[in-house]
A protein has these predicted regions:
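Acidic, glycine/proline-rich Ca2+-coordinating loop motifs
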Residues: 18-185
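Bacterial Sec-dependent N-terminal signal peptides
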Residues: 1-27
Length: 185
């Protein structure tokens, strides 16, 4: 008998909770169209910030650079934010799959300088997946570890370790530190 009352009570609870509420066109906290939430974010054009990066992916059915041959083709890459020159400002590093990695030095006031070429960050670069900052050699300067992967030969997937040369440039030394792993990262 108690079981029947419990089933009846549960059924009534479900039926009551499923009734349709009339739509309310009055503005309120939940009606975003009538009362938009103000945003704390503001879009800054690349012409103002100096940051201009696009991880463009181009598939090619004649090679392994396509979704059919490489399941993770559209997984994307990575971004890292850290102070590479000890000036107290966070710099930005983008990894690119089929495009070069990019390093932007923070000049303050949301202005950045592209130091990719002079920083020597694309040595032995292939398909970069991600980035980690760490002071590997314990000298007080952030080094950069880049994981490599992609639909390339295993011998071309060595992860990269860029040791900070303390002058906004880096030297690739993954082999010297035993960190040139070839597994897909």
């Amino acid at each position: 008998m108690l079981k029947n009352y419990l089933i009846l009570g549960f059924t009534l609870l479900v039926v009551i909770s499923c009734k349709e509420e009339p739509s309310n066109s009055e503005p309120n906290e939940l009606n975003h169209e009538l009362n938009p939430i103000s945003s704390s974010f503001k879009k800054i054009q690349s012409s103002v910030s100096g940051i201009d990066f696009n991880n463009t992916i181009t598939h090619d059915l004649n090679t392994k650079f396509n979704l059919f041959d490489y399941d993770f083709f559209y997984n994307g890459a990575g971004v890292g934010i850290e102070d590479i020159n000890n000036d107290g400002l966070k710099d930005v590093f983008f990894t690119g799959n089929q495009v070069p990695n990019k390093l932007y030095l923070n000049k303050g006031g949301l202005k950045f300088e592209d130091i990719t070429e002079t920083a020597n960050i694309n040595t032995n670069k292939n398909w970069s997946n991600g980035i980690t900052f760490a002071d590997v050699n314990n000298d007080g300067w952030m080094d950069i570890y880049i994981s490599q992967g992609g639909p390339v030969d295993e011998n071309l997937r060595n992860n990269l370790l860029l040791i900070n040369q303390k002058d906004n440039s880096f030297k690739e030394e993954a082999n010297q530190y035993g960190l040139n792993d070839t597994g897909i990262s």
